[in-house]
UniProtKB/Swiss-Prot annotation:
GO molecular function: DNA-binding transcription factor binding; mRNA binding; RNA binding; single-stranded RNA binding; transcription corepressor activity
Compositionally biased tracts (Low complexity): 1-21, 139-176
UniProt organism field: Mus musculus (Mouse)
Name recorded for this polypeptide: RNA binding protein fox-1 homolog 2
Gene symbol of the encoding locus: Rbfox2
Marked site positions, Interaction with RNA: 181, 189-190, 214, 219, 223, 247, 257
Length: 449
């Protein structure tokens, strides 16, 4: 009975050892088997090799039925999270039907179970490739934010591009609307405004063309104003330094005009803006006649009255200073002064007629100058004509000097006869005929200086 009681108490003693079956302990290895009798060593011997085999980690050699050795059934996945493989998470093949072909770039492993979740977002995520190891919850939560971020960046970039394009367009419009003036120098003297406009018109719209002239003609430079500053810069780059009719033109940006406060001389009544000294050079007998006007103011007893037009009396003094022999002073001198085309003086004009068929109308420019009836007579007009057209070929030395004085008395011709570049004939040949020959002899009034 005692052995039977020990045999009945044996399973409770083996209970704690059986609970920790998978762990190797020294007490369990050296634990003697109770109740080892004549027929008892065989269970003990069969128990020790199985314990050592289990201690060596031979889990793969266990029988497929867990309750074969009288132990409670163990959970094969209880403490095995670190050593599990991805196959352990895969559902059995029988629970999943065959997946359809991939749609919209989604991998085949997400075809069936997630088509309902992504049914509304497949069109939005055509370009997104999902990784197989990323949870779908995180993907679905991150992808809209990423998409919104990309959209925000795209909109910001589009706004930036739009601002830049607007800025560039405004700058282009400003540059197009800003006119620019170019200074063109060393151009041919025969060039006129249409020639300069034709030369620069190929680069853009031109607002204004101006060539600077003086009384002799072109000064060899001018200005061209473009409507667009870019066209002006392009024209300056292309035309600067080019050779036009043997002259190397220069094109530069025109600087601002510098207005100097020059002291203006009081202009005369007929438009002359000359000082008395320069005026005496242009017309010496004008200022010589003023002395005779002073003689007129001496009194009636020293002069001979002449009846003029409209009852106006002009007195010719009896005292006469012989400037030119045979010339009746002062009436003819004062009338000749007014006769000398004062309405054309100071301007570049064509060849003044050598023979004045019809005298001009009276210009009330100088006091005391009144046309007389006798001026149109043969005596006075013939004397004036003889003075103007005296030919030195049949004259003596005195008349040659008079003819030279006559040439100097012409206010406009005097400039050319005194010019050493144009007066190439000897002094005896001076006269109106010589001045006219200068015009006929290829003299260009557009000479530079």
């Amino acid at each position: 009975m005692a052995e039977g009681g020990q045999a009945q108490q044996q399973p409770p003693q083996l209970g704690p050892g059986a609970a920790a079956r998978g762990m190797k302990r020294e007490s369990e290895v050296e634990l003697p088997v109770p109740g080892a009798g004549a027929d008892g060593p065989e269970p003990g011997l069969s128990k020790r090799p199985r314990t050592e085999e289990a201690a060596d980690g031979g889990m793969q050699n266990e029988p497929l039925t867990p309750g074969y050795h009288g132990f409670p059934a163990r959970d094969g996945q209880g403490n095995q999270e670190p050593t599990t493989t991805p196959d352990a998470m895969v559902q059995p093949f029988t629970t999943i039907p065959f997946p359809p072909p991939p749609q919209n770039g989604i991998p085949t492993e997400y075809g069936v179970p997630h088509t309902q979740d992504y049914a509304g977002q497949t069109s939005e995520h055509n370009l997104t490739l999902y990784g197989s190891t990323q949870p779908h919850g995180e993907q679905s939560s991150n992808s809209p934010s990423n998409q919104n971020g990309s959209l925000t960046q795209t909109e910001g970039g589009a706004q930036t591009d739009g601002q830049q394009s607007q800025t560039q367009s405004s700058e282009n419009s400003e540059s197009k609307s800003t006119p620019k003036r170019l200074h063109v120098s060393n151009i041919p003297f025969r060039f006129r405004d249409p020639d300069l406009r034709q030369m620069f018109g190929q680069f853009g719209k031109i607002l204004d063309v101006e060539i600077i002239f003086n009384e002799r003609g072109s000064k060899g430079f001018g200005f061209v104003t473009f409507e667009n500053s870019a066209d002006a810069d392009r024209a300056r780059e292309k035309l600067h330094g080019t050779v036009v009719e043997g002259r190397k033109i220069e094109v530069n940006n025109a600087t601002a005009r510098v207005m100097t406060n020059k002291k203006m001389v009081t202009p005369y009544a007929n438009g002359w803006k000359l000082s008395p000294v320069v005026g005496a050079v242009y017309g010496p007998e004008l200022y010589a006649a003023s002395s005779f006007q002073a003689d007129v103011s001496l009194g009636n007893e020293a002069a001979v009255p002449l009846s003029g037009r409209g009852g106006i009396n002009t007195y010719i003094p009896l005292i006469s200073l012989p400037l030119v022999p045979g010339f009746p002073y002062p009436t003819a001198a004062t009338t000749a002064a007014a006769f000398r085309g004062a309405h054309l003086r100071g301007r570049g004009r064509t060849v003044y007629g050598a023979v004045r068929a019809v005298p001009p109308t009276a210009i009330p420019a100088y006091p005391g100058v009144v046309y007389q009836d006798g001026f149109y007579g043969a005596d006075l007009y013939g004397g004036y004509a003889a003075y103007r057209y005296a030919q030195p070929a049949t004259a003596t030395a005195a008349t040659a000097a008079a003819a030279a004085a006559a040439a100097y008395s012409d206010g406009y011709g005097r400039v050319y006869t005194a010019d050493p570049y144009h007066a190439l004939a000897p002094a005896a040949s001076y006269g109106v005929g010589a001045v006219a020959s200068l015009y006929r002899g290829g003299y260009s009034r557009f000479a530079p200086y």
